[in-house]
Amino acid sequence: MKPQFRNTVERMYRGTFFYSFNNRPILSRRNTVWLCYEVKTRGPSMPTWGTKIFRGQVYSKAKYHPEMRFLRWFSKWRQLHHDQEYKVTWYVSWSPCTRCANSVATFLAKDPKVTLTIFVARLYYFWKPDYQQALRILCQKRGGPHATMKIMNYNEFQDCWNKFVDGRGKPFKPRNNLPKHYTLLQATLGELLRHLMDPGTFTSNFNNKPWVSGQHETYLCYKVERLHNDTWVPLNQHRGFLRNQAPNIHGFPKGRHAELCFLDLIPFWKLDGQQYRVTCFTSWSPCFSCAQEMAKFISNNEHVSLCIFAARIYDDQGRYQEGLRTLHRDGAKIAMMNYSEFEYCWDTFVDRQGRPFQPWDGLDEHSQALSERLRAILQNQGN
């Protein structure tokens, strides 16, 4: 027997979905929180046990928030079915507030047979330290039960539309800025949760062997520092990594390079007029177009200095050399990564599990050769 549902609706109107699940990072007057959930019993076939929608108000008491309503309802059901394992998926218009995040973390710690994946359209008060800490506790992976939180991309919006919206047979049509907003929110969530890169991903993509092939992705690790009393002070809240967005039909039709995604992110930090230093560690040096855009950025933001350390030189047989020279001329520091930069990235951005950085054969030789090649490019030698 399934429990009785309260404070739920079966389907959402199309207009309500587009209004409430708009993924623009900063929005006002979105006071209703929608939580669409799917519960499956864990097993070989993973049958769906229930799909419903809870809703609540942002500024009401926490007990009326949809996350708390779900926990009360589901806890009653678990008392009668405590031996069953469940996989729970949420699609929420706002990520949980501090009290809800703490309550969900407590629930998961007490019931390890329940796994929870949370897809969020927007981040709620992500700039507040107490909120950041609550989400880190909820999603921490220190051997205990935890939630997995992700930003909704096109596929999740489409799934939510198909399962929970009264679409009247019409397909989901994304907003034009959905992929750009997704990139911003994904990077922000990575900063907030302090995501780390898989070791294999790092060694594969940052390997500086000159004969590397098949590496079509670009990874960009970044850190930000502020000048205070003649000392550069790290801003650890703005530290993370991202990668290029591959071309696809429903997101970026032409793709978007990692450098452009990074430039999209910087205004989101709302840096003031103090002096800042942004350092990027990239698996490939910028292409001509990205170099031009980065040059424009530092020209328009004189209080921000830019340092770029690249593992390899991106050679598209086009105007990449001109782009690098323009970027260098406009004030950016450009250099090839050497052992120190590789080790720093490994220690800072990689989920290394306590393992020290192990250089590959020829790292120093490749770095030296690439540095000589970059020097010749920047000095316009042989061109």
From Swiss-Prot:
Leader peptide range in chain numbering: none
Site feature (Interaction with DNA) residues: 244
Superkingdom of origin: Eukaryota
Catalytic residues of the enzyme: 259
GO biological process: one example: transposable element silencing
Obligatory cofactor(s): Zn(2+)
Ranges where the record places region Necessary for homooligomerization: 209-335
Region (Interaction with DNA): 213-215, 312-319
UniProt note: domains: The CMP/dCMP deaminase domain 1 mediates RNA binding, RNA-dependent oligomerization and virion incorporation whereas the CMP/dCMP deaminase domain 2 confers deoxycytidine deaminase activity and substrate sequence specificity.
Descriptive protein name: DNA dC->dU-editing enzyme APOBEC-3G
Source species of the chain: Macaca nigra
Lineage: Eukaryota, Metazoa, Chordata, Craniata, Vertebrata
Gene: APOBEC3G
